């Protein structure tokens, strides 16, 4: 029986990220972080939920009213986005214009929305773009 598949050998990991320049990666990753922040601001303005956020460079930390946290972090050397939540850590690479989990194949915004909903205790969906 073959051994475990490494991140770089998994089908989900073979992605368009290999052809991205560092500046393209930074631009695409920044779009993701900005979209998350824009959604949080919208929720606050609409009295939907107050999730505090703090962004430092490529790291965005979300803190929920319960005190729990979700962290989204860019990993420039790997051209990946990392998501840390109660359920674990996930690594995403850009594949066909979408950020896809390198292990399970899930899409970033769907997984982030699921994690936010679980930690907020109600359904919430993160918008894909800040526009």
Spans of model-derived segments:
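N-terminal intrinsically disordered, cationic/polar leader segments
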Residues: 2-131
């Amino acid at each position: 029986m073959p051994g475990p598949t490494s991140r770089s050998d998994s089908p989900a990991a073979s992605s368009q990220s290999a052809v991205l320049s560092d500046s393209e990666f930074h631009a695409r990753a920044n779009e993701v972080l900005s979209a998350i922040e824009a959604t949080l601001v919208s929720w606050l303005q609409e009295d939907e939920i107050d999730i505090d956020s703090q962004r430092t460079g490529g790291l965005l930390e979300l803190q929920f009213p319960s005190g729990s946290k979700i962290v989204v972090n860019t990993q420039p050397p790997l051209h990946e986005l990392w998501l840390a939540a109660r359920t674990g850590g996930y690594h995403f690479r850009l594949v066909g214009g979408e950020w896809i989990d390198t292990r399970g194949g899930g899409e970033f915004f769907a997984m982030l929305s699921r994690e936010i909903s679980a930690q907020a205790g109600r359904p919430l969906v993160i918008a894909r773009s800040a526009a």
